[in-house]
Amino acid sequence: MKSFYTLLVSQWLANIGDVLYIVALIASLYQQTGSAFMAASFPIAVTAGMTLSGLFFARILSRYSLGKTLVLSQLMKTVTLVLVLLTDSIFVLGLVVLIAFLDGFARPIQASFIPRLTKNRQQANSLVQGSNQFIQLAMWPLGTMLVSFTSSAFALIVSLVLFVLSTIVTIYFNQSLTEDIVNDGAEESITLRASLTYVNTSPFARHVTWFVTYESFVSTLWISALLLVYLERHLQVDTGWWGTLNATFLISMIAASAHLYRSRRAPSLPSTAIISIVAALLFGMTAHLAFAILALVIQGAATQIRIIQTNTVIQEQIPATQLPYVYSVQQTGYALAFSVGSLLFGLLADGLPIDSVYLLGALLTLPLIWIGRLTEQSMLTVSSV
């Protein structure tokens, strides 16, 4: 359990550093170019990096253990951030792609370690996800304040210090491991194709991957940009409420994590999809701010429960040797689906009334009930074998 908390601390340091460097670079790019498009291009750069990492993940892991790969990815992120500090041009976006590429190795590995480090997987996943959301909730406004009161360069230096500390803790974590996952098969068997083949041939892995991917697609209905459009066009209230809506969503996710941390059971995947449909319908039909906030509370909790539940059942049902590869495939699917969803709902918001977009989103969430049911049925099949 000590190793789990060491891993968690390294993840906290890296995540705080991630938020700070992104806030700093967004502000810096906007100041340099005056282009909102350049400042808004970060999600595209991050998605590109995450997608590319999925193409190389299996090959890298065939050469290095999970612990060593985690250390190398964090160390190279630190070196890349040094290059960001030395780069004063729009080419910094290429370095953002590289950092996201390295993150694409770290995140599946961190999730894969959980079943090896702790027995209570639901509790562990609740702690991981809840703390991640708390960092997002706290660090975005704090990061913005740091940049405003100092400079983007100073915020980047603070981020670099955090990356260095994360690297040190990660090295300590790797050295403290008594057992690591090392592939015993032939090197040529561990490829992206082999990972995709496993996901495709295992009913549970296939269904849960489709669930994670489709959930990523429909979750873009609730991105911050659409919430701003909803406030301006539908509720027609002061956009100062935008921050409140975003904070409400994150606080709801943290509360759901706290509940599952103490609970032994969690709602089924299909039931959380139904709850999300209710939230989208309420959000699209109401004309009152209070009910809109209530819908966000409902949706935030349902989303977090799905994230924790899917991670928990994946760690329980997928063999430890296959777990990192399944996570890598899912991460690639997640990133692509999130990009497609953001683009689709953004285009719909330009052409339709925003309330109609949320009602359509409720309709598009319906297949998630069916996919969730298939996932749980295949999970029962695996458990009975």
Language model segments and positions:
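Hydrophobic transmembrane alpha-helices of multi-pass secondary transporters
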Residues: 3-6, 10-11, 38, 42, ...
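Hydrophobic alpha-helical transmembrane segments
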Residues: 90-94, 100-101, 123-177, 247-248, ...
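C-terminal transmembrane bundle of multi-pass solute transporters/carriers
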Residues: 40-59, 63, 67-73, 232-385
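A single, central transmembrane helix in multi-pass transporters
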Residues: 150-157, 196-254
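Substrate-agnostic recognition of the 12-TM MFS/MFS-like secondary transporter fold
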Residues: 6-22, 46-58, 70-77, 95-148, ...
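MFS-fold secondary transporters
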Residues: 21, 30, 80-84, 99, ...
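Juxtamembrane intracellular "pre-TM" segments in multi-pass secondary transporters
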Residues: 1-4, 175-210
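Short amphipathic helix-loop junctions that connect adjacent transmembrane helices
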Residues: 20-37, 225-240
